[in-house]
């Protein structure tokens, strides 16, 4: 009887250990590091990250922009960023990823790195806090490609660009956005910051 109980215990421990190993393999991150910048806006919360499928990396991007609203409108400027992930060097074989975006504006056409190059770094144009005034958060974004070419989104011009992020040597595989939710009659800023995920391979 004791031998049977011992065998059952060993079997249970084996299953638990195997299951634990399977879980560890399942959640193993597909990215090498997370890269950010220092001048992001202060409002909002970090949304969920979105990743390119396995074997894909970002070689283009598009932005969601609300045009200037005039007086007494409420400007939000950049509301979202999408990564356009490719497999190999074909723009026809693409997958679009988007973390949470703001409610206003429309999406631009994608901007692509030349040839077989891919996105490796970014910087943000952010309007600093103004009081009294209409705050906007992120106004525009630039991405640097692996061949050194810099791409700038068709955003707005309030604020200044900060320093470039660190570079992702093997490319960008995902992003995460910091978004302020709609505030009704109060001042909205929408997109305030982003992070990018560097590919592991």
UniProtKB/Swiss-Prot annotation:
Keywords: Disulfide bond, Secreted, Signal. CDD domains: VMO-I. It is found in: Secreted. Coiled coil: none annotated. Disulfide bonds join 52-85, 113-145, 168-198, 173-199. Residues 1-21 form the signal peptide. It comes from the Eukaryota. Its main location: secreted. GO terms for cellular component: extracellular region. InterPro entries: VOMI (IPR005515), VOMI_sf (IPR036706). Belongs to the VMO1 family. This is Vitelline membrane outer layer protein 1 homolog. It comes from Mus musculus (Mouse).
